[in-house]
């Protein structure tokens, strides 16, 4: 159970840090000329990873806690 608690806390910390990074970088990318066209695949990948973290944390929270 201790390993799960540590893993869960690490995932929540990763979500917080990744969200902070997205809040800082996405407006810069969208404000730059041709930012969307040049970085479209990176933006979608980052959004997919963020949603994956949110759903993974939600599922783990519902199952184990």
Swiss-Prot record:
GO terms for cellular component: chloroplast thylakoid membrane; photosystem II reaction center. Its main location: plastid. Keywords: Chloroplast, Membrane, Photosynthesis, Photosystem II, Plastid, Reaction center, Thylakoid, Transmembrane, Transmembrane helix. The keyword Membrane applies. Disulfide bonds: none annotated. It is a multi-pass membrane protein. One of its GO terms (biological process) is photosystem II stabilization. The chain crosses the membrane at residues 11-31, 44-64. It is found in: Plastid, Chloroplast thylakoid membrane. Pfam families: Ycf9. PANTHER family: PHOTOSYSTEM II REACTION CENTER PROTEIN Z. PSII is composed of 1 copy each of membrane proteins PsbA, PsbB, PsbC, PsbD, PsbE, PsbF, PsbH, PsbI, PsbJ, PsbK, PsbL, PsbM, PsbT, PsbY, PsbZ, Psb30/Ycf12, at least 3 peripheral proteins of the oxygen-evolving complex and a large number of cofactors. It forms dimeric complexes. May control the interaction of photosystem II (PSII) cores with the light-harvesting antenna, regulates electron flow through the 2 photosystem reaction centers. PSII is a light-driven water plastoquinone oxidoreductase, using light energy to abstract electrons from H(2)O, generating a proton gradient subsequently used for ATP formation. Belongs to the PsbZ family. This is Photosystem II reaction center protein Z. It comes from Euglena gracilis. The gene is psbZ.
């Amino acid at each position: 159970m201790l390993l799960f608690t540590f893993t869960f806390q690490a995932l929540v910390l990763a979500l917080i840090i990744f969200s902070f990074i997205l809040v800082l970088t996405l407006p810069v990318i969208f404000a730059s000329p041709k930012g969307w066209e040049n970085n479209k695949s990176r933006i979608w990948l980052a959004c997919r990873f963020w949603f994956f973290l949110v759903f993974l944390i939600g599922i783990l929270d519902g199952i184990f806690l």
